[in-house]
């Protein structure tokens, strides 16, 4: 980190890159003794962006530590924002992963899930610890997401790889084929007959 003083941070306020209160929090942390106490997910995300802008590893570490704490109180209203923060910054949080796995059906019914890109959907659903009663539940989550997305055949194939087709009945496959656009149907049939599968833990 290059040397800077308080006035350098004050100058940032005039550039309108970061909020004034965020700059003040960073200034007091870097040059004072104030700790980061905010529980605002949005503020923590902006603080982390500022820490990266300043190349201040100490501030980054403190923000991550605080986000880890806030993550313990994650809910359906903020899960996607928190998830995006960790994913975009190459970070992991076991509590976040556990929350997603245990509440997958509720999460997949949110608008935030339907707006995710294909990589995020795969990241969320391709997990052996997801708690579901049957694999068809996961397939329906993917189908609902596809209703809101127009993806190419490569992305369709990619997202379908999260399905353990060994646990899908032919009747369930037939129902799924009826729900998807015609251009995907042959691909889905082919994937089913390949029986690509990995273990899945089911909630009995």
From Swiss-Prot:
<feature type="domain" description="BACK">
    <location>
        <begin position="95"/>
        <end position="177"/>
    </location>
</feature>
<dbReference type="InterPro" id="IPR009177">
    <property type="entry name" value="Orthopox_C5"/>
</dbReference>
<dbReference type="InterPro" id="IPR011705">
    <property type="entry name" value="BACK"/>
</dbReference>
<protein>
    <recommendedName>
        <fullName>Protein OPG030</fullName>
    </recommendedName>
</protein>
<comment type="similarity">
    <text>Belongs to the orthopoxvirus OPG030 family.</text>
</comment>
<dbReference type="Pfam" id="PF07707">
    <property type="entry name" value="BACK"/>
</dbReference>
<keyword id="KW-0244">Early protein</keyword>
